[in-house]
Amino acid sequence: MITLYPKRLFKFPVDAECISPDVFAEKSSDEIGKLRIWEGNRKRSLSDVFKIKSETGSSSEEFTIKIRGDVSKVRKIGFKMSMGNIIVEGDAGMHLGEGMNGGVITVTGNADSWAGAKMKGGTIEVKGNVGDYIGASYRGSTQGMNGGKIIIHGNAGYEVGCFMMNGLIKVNGNVGRYAGVHMRNGTIFIQGNSEGRAGAQMINGKIVVCGHIPSILPTFTVDDIKPKVKVNGEKVEGPFYRFIGDLADKGKGKLFVSKTRNPQLNSYEKYLEYNI
């Protein structure tokens, strides 16, 4: 196991995609300390900004990196990692777990935007809140998250799962607008409230909103009322309105919205062939 301690509170962004079990495994502390990073526009060694403590005895698959301290300015932690564990005891910066294929990242605090962007496997768990574009594609790209799990215990920002292609995003708190925008497949499970416009331009996939949503986009049609919905093999008690869309994009995505928490949507029931 390797433990990293920030030597100071960072003023400028630190680009440290080398902080990954794939890179650290089989390296000595001295070799790890010589890995190159960027702090602002200056190239530095990892040991310039982190104190590095090494403990032997972990296999490659169980290799763990522990980061103790505020690394909210440190970007690309866990970049393209495929195995092992990263534990951040504090806040993490942007692009956490970008493109990861396996392994587990756990953050005890908050994480900034783009966490899990373009990830293909593995698990990211954030005990606090996250920023925007979780599990999303980058601007100009149509390749979002394509596997793995992202679990957020707090709230998430705008465009959760933008261009999502597969996998699971679970948010225990609330989300901003445009959750599941351009979604291709996969599941977004929101236990709290949504600020609205969920599923805009989605083609396929499943979005579940257990809390309040102000309104449904007019390009979605109500299809049914379901007593429960299945998320990642587990049944979530409803009842839920089931909407299909986005019809403007010939989409067949499913948007499940709590009936109990959204009495303002009762008018949709007249469009069903029968009332439940």
Residue locations for each model-derived region?
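Intrinsically disordered, low-complexity terminal regions
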Residues: 1-70, 76, 125-127, 140-153, ...
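Short, charge-rich binding segments
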Residues: 57-59, 77-80, 89, 95-99, ...
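Tandem repeat scaffolds
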Residues: 81, 93, 100, 112, ...
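Long, hydrophobic, well-ordered secondary-structure blocks that form the structural core
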Residues: 100, 104-106, 123
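Right-handed parallel beta-helix/beta-solenoid
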Residues: 117-118, 122, 139-141
